[in-house]
C-alpha cells in the first residue's frame, strides 16, 4: 500500500474525531478556532502578520528567537528543530533560513492544527509539516507517522504568537518538554497582557496576552531553567493598537 501524503490525509480525516483522539480539552471549541483561521486568515496570513509588525518588527522577532536558539548549549550541526503552531510558516521559513546558514545539516519541522495553514506550509522549502495540537505534540507525532517521517524528540522547539490561542498553557509547556531531548531548549514568543478584547473575535485569540511573571511561574513547574524577557521596541500595531511582546527561553 503506497504511503499517504499530508494532502491525502487532510482530505480523508474527520477533524473533530481526530482532535478528540488527540485529547483536545474542548474539541468543539478548537474546531471553531480552526474554522476561524481557515475562513479569515489562511490565505492572507503572511500579509496580516506583516501589517501588524512591519519589516523591522518581523526582523526583531526573528532575531530575538535566533539569539536564544543559538545560546548555550549550542545546537549540534544535525539538530532537529520544531515550530509549534507554525501557521503558514511565515516565521518558520525566516528562522529556518537563518539557522541553515549556521547549521546546514539541521532538519526543520512545522506543526499546526489548521489544514489550510498546512497546505501553505507545504510550499515552504526544506520544512516538513504535520498536523497536531500544542497540548499533545507527542500524540500528534504518532499520528503523523502515517504520512511523514517525524522524529520523536527535538533538539529545539520554538513558537511565535501561538500560545495565546491555547486554552491550557501549562499543558502546552508539558507537551513541549516531553518532545525535547536531554539538554534541549524551547523559545516562545508571544504577547504581553493587553486590553483589546476585540482580538478574540478578530483573530480568534483565547487569551488577551500574558503577564511575563505568570509565564515564568507556569513554565517553572515543568522546566528547571526558565528566562522570560520583554522584547523592547517591538509592538503589534493595528489601527493604533499596540501590544508588547515577550520571549521565554525554557531549558530541560
Model-identified regions with their sequence ranges:
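Conserved class I S-adenosyl-L-methionine
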Residues: 2-74, 90-94, 120, 136
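Short catalytic micro-motifs in class I SAM-dependent methyltransferases
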Residues: 161-162
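A short glycine-rich, Lys/Arg-flanked "PGG" loop and its adjoining helix->strand segment in the class I
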Residues: 170-182
Amino acid at each position: 500500500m503506497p504511503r499517504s501524503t499530508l494532502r491525502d490525509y487532510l482530505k480523508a480525516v474527520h477533524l473533530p474525531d481526530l482532535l478528540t483522539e488527540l485529547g483536545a480539552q474542548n474539541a468543539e471549541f478548537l474546531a471553531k478556532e480552526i474554522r476561524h483561521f481557515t475562513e479569515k486568515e489562511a490565505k492572507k496570513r503572511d500579509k496580516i502578520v506583516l501589517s501588524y509588525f512591519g519589516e523591522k518588527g518581523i526582523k526583531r522577532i526573528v532575531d530575538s528567537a535566533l539569539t536564544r536558539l543559538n545560546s548555550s548549549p549550542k545546537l549540534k550541526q544535525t539538530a532537529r528543530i520544531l515550530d509549534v503552531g507554525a501557521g503558514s510558516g511565515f516565521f518558520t521559513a525566516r528562522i529556518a533560513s537563518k539557522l541553515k546558514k549556521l547549521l546546514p545539516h539541521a532538519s526543520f519541522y512545522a506543526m499546526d492544527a489548521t489544514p489550510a495553514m498546512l497546505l501553505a506550509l507545504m510550499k515552504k522549502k526544506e520544512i516538513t509539516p504535520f498536523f497536531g495540537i500544542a497540548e499533545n505534540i507527542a500524540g500528534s507525532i504518532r499520528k503523523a507517522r502515517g504520512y511523514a517521517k517525524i522524529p520523536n524528540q527535538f533538539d529545539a522547539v520554538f513558537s511565535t504568537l501561538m500560545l495565546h490561542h491555547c486554552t491550557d498553557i501549562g499543558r502546552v509547556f508539558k507537551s513541549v518538554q516531553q518532545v525535547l531531548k536531554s539538554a534541549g531548549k524551547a523559545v516562545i514568543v508571544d504577547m504581553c497582557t493587553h486590553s483589546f478584547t476585540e482580538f478574540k473575535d478578530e483573530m480568534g485569540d483565547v487569551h488577551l496576552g500574558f503577564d511575563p511573571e505568570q509565564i515564568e511561574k507556569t513554565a517553572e513547574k515543568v522546566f528547571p531553567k526558565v528566562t522570560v524577557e520583554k522584547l523592547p521596541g517591538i509592538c503589534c500595531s493595528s489601527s493604533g493598537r499596540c501590544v508588547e511582546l515577550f520571549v521565554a527561553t525554557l531549558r530541560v
